[in-house]
Structure formats: structure tokens, C-alpha cells
Amino acid sequence: MFVVGQRWISESENNLGLGIVTASDNRTVTIQFPAAEEERIYALSVAPLTRVQFQKGDRINSVEGWQLDVEEVVENQGFIIYLGKRADSGEEAVLPEMQLDHKVSFSKPQDRLFSAQIDRSDRFALRYRALQHQQAQFQSPLRGMRGIRASLIPHQLHIAKEVGQRVAPRVLLADEVGLGKTIEAGMILQQQLFSGRVERVLVLVPESLQHQWLVEMLRRFNLKFSLFDEERCSDFDKADEDGNDVSENPFDSEALVIASIDWLESSPNRAKQVLASHWDMLIVDEAHHLAWSEDEPSVGYQFVERLSKQTPAVLLLTATPEQLGQESHFARLALLDADRFYDYHSFIAEQKDYKPVADAVATLLNDKPLSHDEQNSIAELLSEKDTEPMFKVINSEKSKENDRLQVRQELIRELIDRHGTSRVLFRNTRQGVKGFPHRVYHQITLEMPSQYTNALKVMGMMGGVTKDDQLYPERLFQRMNPAAKWADFDPRIEWLITFLKNHRDEKILVICKQADTAIALEQILREREAIRSAVFHEKMSIVERDRASAYFAQMEEGAQVLISSSIGSEGRNFQFASNLVLFNLPDNPDLLEQSIGRLDRIGQKNDIQIHVPCFENSMQMVLATWYHQGLNAFEETCPMGAALFREFGEELEGFLKNPQAVGFDEFLVRTFKRQQQLKAELEQGRDRLLELNSNGGEVAQALAEAIAKEDNNPHLVNFALSLFDVIGLEQEDLGEQSIVISPTGHMLVPDFPGIAEDGTTVTFDRQLALMREDVEFLTWDHPMIRNGIDLITSGYIGKSAISLLINKNLPAGTLLLEAIYMVETQAPKGLNLTRFLPPTPVRILLDNKGNDMAAQVSFAGLEKQLKPLNKQMANKIAKMAQADIKKLIGISEQKIAAKLPELIEKASQDADSTLSAELHRLTSLQAVNKNIRSDEIEALEQQRIESLKQIALANWRLDSLRVIVSNKE
């Protein structure tokens, strides 16, 4: 049976490669596996081995590296010799089986079937379902938005969908604080990455926000960005023996990069390297800090300007236009489209033209009759439409309410499309979005301890008292008395302990200036008072912060209080808590708003209680009073806070240095009066038309509801659990809608992407994921699911199977063939053809006469009737029925070839319809809205042409097959 020199493969250890018989006797056979450098000795009676014999038409590899197209197979004294022509030269050649490549693998399902590499039937089923789900996800309009670890906020989803599906989007995101600009940018980015339009991304942020972006992108979107600074870049600096610079560009080493714009401004060489690298998308946060004037733009602005000109997609995140001032606002728009926004004075004139229209929209929204002037403004802008009948419906008391509503909505839609900046600017306000809680301020006045008073006096006599020393005296005291403990006498500690004991059932966030303060506070609460507490600061790793956050989020056994440094809490939101204690007061209004913003977010269910313990007649008290009575910054968001701080900062400094100085009350009155004036100007400057476009209305609400509906669909849970089971991952149900997934020693793959060695806790529940940042939130967009699908569909799992069909109506031994074909295109990713023709599985189920029964016999229905076969019996069937199986495969190829034109035609119609409609819309709008870029229209037309061309080239391939043999029982 076995002859030395023959080639066999191990059925149980496919990874060993092609074996060669080195010895054989009456009881055993010895096989050498050169590729794996392994040897096995098998008992002849149970040897799990299959003889390798290629067929005419196969292309096989020699051990020397050349390939042979087999034309004839000759057997001589137990050895196989292959005759044919070399693939490289076409010359006739002979290849004895001993000279076959040792690393042979069988990728075609039929080759695997006939070489005894037969998989379990349940794995074949999982593979088919994975292919079906992959197809569905490629075509889902929710892709890139549903997987975010965040609440489903309609206006955010609307902006993300509107911008994320554009070709090379260039927009300004200018929502008010707390409305989620970072989340909007992340969802836009996610969609662009999924579609393949974007691969390399640069995020430029102020230095203080680098870690916030790193955390947000990882925790909310599962995007692993790399933080670049001078230390990291210096590792790439090199010189040759002659001292010539041969450095590599560090920015070419990663695809997703975060860098500080402050650093690049001060480092021309690094800025030059950034410009030399290629980026598909640029995101700039806090873009309003890029100073610009017509005569003297800043270094930072000029750098971003150069970068934006060579980067196709640009997202600028900025303060609201009213906060910026029109000149600064114009400068940001010019970064997005320099051809459109080329002259500031023309821009101002154009904006004035839209003011009457915005007023008219406000009237439409309030369901009031339009004035004569408002009608003229609308008619002028919609000059190509007959608006007179529409105005009659709106202004007539006899009109039906539903008719008035429809006309109002149509007019508003038309006006939005023609709005001056509606395609490049999105801005939502809290007033427009609604759903925010109230904020209630509680000032706690305490007597300053003598230890602090003495320390300030001593340092004052030495001439070394700083503003920080007076605002945060505990740091000064500790610096002067390293052995002493400020917490032993600071009355804020006792107040905090009492407060916590009086609010045992509530979650409380405490924010301090420094990490050391937070650490000391947490230790006292935990050790001295046995209060369940967690600490959160910048010295902790992201994993440690996740654990602290999760401990705080637990409702029953979790921490009552989380004590955080001001930097440590960046990027983290705790909407489930409604009590905020500012142990240290931030020293500017923006930082104050950031701190309150940890709780004051969309999704907060309760009014926010803000507690500020201050020392009487101190700098702390002056600042707190100015924030409250001057800016009203505790109880309302204060978008004009930075402007007021600049305007009154110098005068405020005098009162901070001398808390009892005369004139403070009058100063508060002046500040508040100016605050009210700026607030009124902001309200008057609100562009209701722009807000309406940014908000999304009913369409946005429907989008949120669609994702919520998918959240509750059991298909993902069922598929994921089957996936984990087949791969060999251990699953432990923790209750509370979470499970722990752990690796085992019998997995199909060495490691599964995203699973930690000690296990990973996952949930399919969005609300739990929002509360527990240490738990992975699984959706169809999550890398664990996407990688799992790729693992199944791109490998050999489930490619060939043999099953037993128990059916009394069929003669025993009846042969069926279930073939799964893939119809797909080989097109550039940037075309995003998967929307129209994703890799599409086509199931063909042939009986022994070659009839396709797939339409009559469902996959799920057939699956229930199938029984597994042991491997030995499956191999026997494959060998015995080889000729019949090959015949059925040939028939199935004819069937799929006949189906292909219909699939191509449908995909072509979908692509042409979708892309032509968008093209027509943009072309029509360009005539009435200058913000429709010509290059965007040209790119879309080119995309349409290329898409139709590539879809026409789609082809099929056999992905997997299952042989089914019937039996009576």
C-alpha cells in the first residue's frame, strides 16, 4: 500500500504540508514532512493519511519553484509522474511526485474534498452565514454609524451620514460645546475608512487634547491612532558615515496619526515632514485657534492651509461662527474651499443677503403668515419656482393645516439647498437641539485654615506667591512642608466626607487640579472613611482608567465617588452621575465648561448639581463669584466666556490679588451686563436655516430609530456566539447582558483578534457599554466581528463538507451537491462598489440529475435535516463518488454562469440610479448655490463611469461546497 517516495498528507494535521514516505513495514508507516521539519509514525490500521494525486488541468509547484500545467498523469510501480508544460516557458516537462513542493496547499473546495481535507458541516453552515452577513453589512446604510459607543443622537447621526457618504468631504463642524463634534468627526471618518475612500488620516489638535482624542477614537470607534511627538520622531533621525541626513519620514510609519499643532508650529522640520507625507483626510480640532488676518495669517494657519490644499478630505472642528467673529469664520471656510471663499468683503455682503431669508424661515417654522418683505426675499432666492401659490396657502386662514405644513416644509427644503454655506458648515445649538438638563450652583463657604494663611504670608514675604499658590494653597503648603499632610486640616475634606455620607445613594464626580491631590483624596476616603471610591488621573494607563471608570459606573457594588484630575478626565463622560464637586476651581471659563461638560451632555437624565467649596475672602471665592454672578457660567453654558475673559481678564486679575478691594460688586454688574449683551448678539445672529439643515429633523430621528431597531435584532448575537463556538473560544455568561470570551488550547487559529489572554468581556447592549468602558460593545462594525467574518471567509474553514440527509422519501445513497459561489468585482476600494455589488454568495443545490432546488429547499430547512458523518466515512464517500461530484460541479458552473448577467444588470442599475441621482442633484444645485464644488461633481461623474465599468467585469468563483448523501434513518 505504501511505497517509499510516495506523497501523502495528514488528515488531522493539514499544516504539516506534503509528506513523503520514508519507511514502511507490516504494522507502521513513517512519513517525513520536510516543510514542517517533522516526522510521524502511524499504525497502518488507523493512519489518518490521504494519497495526493493531482489531475489533468491542475497547475502544480515543483520543489525548485517552477510550475507545471498537468496534461497527463502516469503511474509506475506505485509512483506518480506528471507530464505537461512549464507555466513560465511553455516547454514540455516531467515532474515526479518526489519533486513536488513540500508546502502544497489545497485552496479550491473540490481539491480539499478529494484530498481528505473535509470540514464539519456546522462550519460549512457558519461560513455561508458569514458570507451572507458580510454581504448585508457592506450594503447597510447604517455602516460606520451603528458601532459607535455612544447614545443615538439624531443630529449627530444626520451630520455623520450627510458628510460621511460624500466623496472627499470638506466641512466645518461648529456645534456648540457638549453637542458632540468629536463624535460627528469620528463617525464621518469611520464611514470613509469602511468605504475605502480614506486610509491615511492626520488629526491635528492642541497639545492638551491629544490624549482625549486618542481615548475617544479607541473607546468609541475602536480606531487605534498613534500619538506623534518629538521623542517618537527622533527615533527615525539617521545620518550615514559622511554625516548626510538619511532619515526616514516618521509620519509614513503609521496610517492613523494624532499630533499637536503647537509642536508642529514650533518645529519647521517636522512640519515639512508632515507636508511631505501623503494624507487622505485631515482633521483639525479647535481650528478657531489658528489666528488669521488678511494681512498677517499665523504660522499655524499657513501650515494648515498648505496641508489642506494637498489633502482631499478636510474636517475642521471649531467654535460657533458667532463666537469666532465673521473674519475668523471666513478664514476657516477659506481653508475648505479657497476658490469659493476668496474675498472677505464679498463673503460679508453675501451673508447679509441671507439674513432676510433666515428671518423668513423663522416665520415658517413658527407657522406664522409671511410678511411682504419675507415673501420677496424667498421669491428672489427661488427665482426659478412659482412661489406665489405657495405663499397663498401659507397666508390664507382658509388653508388646511396639513396643506400649510406641506408647503412650509417644501419651502424650507428648497431654501436649505440654496443656503450660502449649508454644504460646508454644520452648526447645532443647545437651544435648537433641546434635551439638556438644568444646572444648579451650590457655593460652600469655608474658613481658610491658619496653616494656609501662614504659608501664603511666608511665601509673600519672600516674594514668591503665584496665582496657582493662592488658588490651590494645598500645593504650596505641601511644597513648603513635605513631611506634613495638608489633608489633616483642610476643611474641604470634612465637608466632602459629610456630603458623601449624606448622599450615599448618588454618584459623585470630584475634579481636582492635580493628580497628586486626587490620589490623596481617594486614599483618605477609602482608608479613613471606608467610602467606595475610585481615582482617575493622567499618570494611569488607559486600561487602569477604564477599570476605574467601570467601577464608578456599577450601580450597586461600584464606587460612590470618582476623584479625577482635570487632565485625567478629558475625553470621559459620566452622564449617569449628576453631582459634580469642583474641589479645585479651573482658572479660566473654557476649562470650567470642560469640567461641567463631563456630566452636562446629551443623555443626562437629571439636573446637574455643581458644588464648589471655597475659602472665605480668598482668590478662590473671587473667581467663583465672577464665574457665577458675572458670567453665569455655572448654571448656563457660556459660549462668550473666553471673549469676556480676554476683555475683563486684566481687571479681574487685580481683584484676584486683592479679594477685599473696593469696586468688585460694580465690576460684577459690568461683566454681567456685557455678558447679556453678547448673549443677545449671539441669539440675534443665529442662523435658523443653517441649524435646521444641521439638525436633520425627522430624517435624523428615523436614522436613530433604525439603528436602535438593529441594536435589538438577535441575528448578531446568534451569529457571534456560533462564531466563537466554532473557533473554540470559551464563553462564560456573566449575566447583566455581558459574557467573557476567553482563548483556549483547542482553537482553530493561534489567536483571535481582540481577545486578551485572560479573556475579554463583551456586551451587545448599548446602554451597558455606555456605563462600562471596560466592556467591548459588539456590533456588526466592531473589529472582533469583522475580523471574525474575515477569518472564516478568507481561510479554509468550512470550504468543503459532507453530510448525511435523513429523508424517507429519497432512495438511500442519493447524492446532492450544495455549492456556494461568490459573485464579486476586483475594483479599487475608493469606488465603494460594495454598496451595489458586495461579494455576493449564490447558493446552488443540485440533485443527482442536476436540477437546482435552492429556491424550493431553504438553507435553514435543509440544515435541520442533516446529520454529521465521521471523517473516515466522509473520506470514503468523497473517493467513491468523485466522478459524480465532479459532474455536478460542472453543472453548477453552468448554472452560476447563467445567473451572472442578471446580478450584474441589477447592480449596474442600482449604481447608475444612485450616482446619477446624486449627480443630477448637485448639478442642479450648483446653478443656485456656489458651495457645490465643480471638482466634487467631476469626481462623482468619474466615479459613476468607472463604477459601471468595473461592475460589468464582475465574475464568479466557487467558494465552498457540501456533498449530501441521503439515508432512510
From Swiss-Prot:
Superkingdom is Bacteria
Q: What CDD domains does the database record attribute to this sequence?
A: DEXDc_RapA, SF2_C_SNF
Q: Which UniProt keywords apply?
A: Activator, ATP-binding, DNA-binding, Helicase, Hydrolase, Nucleotide-binding, Transcription, Transcription regulation
Residues of the Helicase ATP-binding domain: 162-339
> Its Gene Ontology molecular function terms?
ATP binding; DNA binding; helicase activity; hydrolase activity, acting on acid anhydrides
- What EC number(s) is this enzyme filed under? 3.6.4.-
Q: How does it assemble?
A: Interacts with the RNAP. Has a higher affinity for the core RNAP than for the holoenzyme. Its ATPase activity is stimulated by binding to RNAP.
> Which NCBIfam families does UniProt cross-reference here?
PRK04914.1
Return the protein name: RNA polymerase-associated protein RapA
The scientific name of the source species is: Actinobacillus pleuropneumoniae serotype 7 (strain AP76)
Q: What is the lineage of its organism?
A: Bacteria, Pseudomonadati, Pseudomonadota, Gammaproteobacteria, Pasteurellales
